[in-house]
Amino acid sequence: MKQTVWHHLKLCPQGDPQHTLADAAIAVENGTIVWLGAACALPVEYAAWPREDLHGAWVTPGLVDCHTHLVYGGQRADEFAQRLAGVSYEEIARQGGGIVSTVRATRAADEASLLRQSAARLEPLLAEGVTTVEIKSGYGLDLASERKMLRVARQLGERYPVTVYTTFLGAHALPPEFTGRADAYIDEVCNTMLPALADEGLVDAVDVFCERIGFSLEQSERVFKAAERYQLPVKMHAEQLSNGGGTALAARHHALSADHLEFLDEAGVAAMKEAGTVAVLLPGAYYFIRETQLPPLELLRRYQVPIAISTDSNPGTSPATSLLLMMNMATTLFRMTVPEVLQGVTSHAARALGKADRHGSLEAGRAADFAVWSVDSLAELAYWIGRPLCARVVRAGETVYTRRELSQGLR
C-alpha cells in the first residue's frame, strides 16, 4: 500500500484559475486521491504519511488532448510546400493528395513501424502534462488497416503512462478503390468495419467527417445509427470549411462533441446547447491551413456551450504536438481567455470524451493524475511560446516524467 501526501503546492483542482488554493495538499493512496484541500486542514489520519514537497509549484489536473490523429504513416511536408505556393487544401485533396496520401503510407506501414512513428508524436504531449489523449483511426479506410491503427493506439496506452481513448473514424475520406461510390463505402463502414472493430473491443467512440469534401448529412447519419446499434457515443468533424448543417445532425444524435466549427451558425450553437454537445476548437488547423473564418466564440459563450481545445495532431492540417501552443493560439487567434483555455484542456476536454467523471479535474475518489508547473501564474501556460513549463507529471500517484534542468553555472 503506497500512501503519499503531496504538499507545499498551489492547487487549481477544476482547471479554473479563478478557483484555486494558495497552500494546498493532496493525499494519495494506491494511486487514488483520498483527500485534497487547504494544507492547514489536512486530516489527522494523513499527517504521518510520507510527504512529497512541491516547493510552492502550481498543480493542475493532467491535461486532456481530446482530438488527435496521432497514429499514421509518413508525413506531408511536400503538400505543405504546395499550399505555400498557393494550392488550396481542397484542391490537393481532389488531386488524390491530402488524407488519401496518408492512407497509402499508413496501409504500407507495419504495426511496429506505426507504433514507433506514433510514439514519437505522443512523447512531446506527455512532457507537457498530458495524461489523457484521444486517438482516431481514419487513415486506413479498410478493415485491416483501421484495425492496425486502433491496435497501435491501444498499445500506446499500454506502453506509456497515459490513458488512451480510441475513436473509429472510418468515414474520414473516400478510399481510392471506392472512387465515385461513397454510399457503397459507407455500407462497408457500417456493415463490415464497425461491427468487427467494435466486437474486438477496439472502439470507444465513432466519428465522421461531414463536409463537402467528406461525407454528406445522410451518409453521416447512417454512420451514427450504426454506432448507436453498438451503444457507442458519436462525435463529428463539422463546419470546418462550410456550413453544411452537420453540427445540428450531431446534436440530434447527442454527440459528445462537434469539432472545428469555423462556419457554425447560431442554429447549430443552439442545437449543441440543447444536446449538451461540447464545442472542440482546433486552432492548429485554423492556423496551418490559413483559415480566415473564426469559430463563433461569442455565440458559444452566449449559449454557454462548453468549449474544449485540442491539438488535432495530424499530418495534413495540424502537425502539432504541443497542447500548450494550442492554448496560446486559442487566446491569440480565437480571442479566448486564460480561464477558458485552461478549462478547455482539462474539464471541458474530458467532457468532450464523455469522461468528465474520470479526468479533467482533481477530487477525492479519482485517479491522482496531475501536472506540476514551473510558473508563477497559470496565465503563463497560455503566454509562453515554446518554453518547457511542465516540471513533473504524476499519473495514478506516481511520477512518470520529470524535466531535466540545464546547468545554470557560469563558465
Curated annotation (Swiss-Prot):
This is Imidazolonepropionase. It catalyses: 4-imidazolone-5-propanoate + H2O = N-formimidoyl-L-glutamate. Keywords: Cytoplasm, Histidine metabolism, Hydrolase, Iron, Metal-binding, Zinc. Fe(3+) binds at H67, H69, H237, D312. NCBIfam families: hutI. GO terms for cellular component: cytoplasm. It comes from Paraburkholderia xenovorans (strain LB400). InterPro entries: Amidohydro-rel, HutI, Metal-dep_hydrolase_composite, Metal_Hydrolase. It is found in: Cytoplasm. 4-imidazolone-5-propanoate binds at R76, Y139, H172, Q240, T317. Pfam families: Amidohydro_1. Catalyzes the hydrolytic cleavage of the carbon-nitrogen bond in imidazolone-5-propanoate to yield N-formimidoyl-L-glutamate. It is the third step in the universal histidine degradation pathway. Binds 1 zinc or iron ion per subunit. Zn(2+) binds at H67, H69, H237, D312. One of its GO terms (biological process) is L-histidine catabolic process to glutamate and formamide. Its cofactor is Zn(2+); Fe(3+).
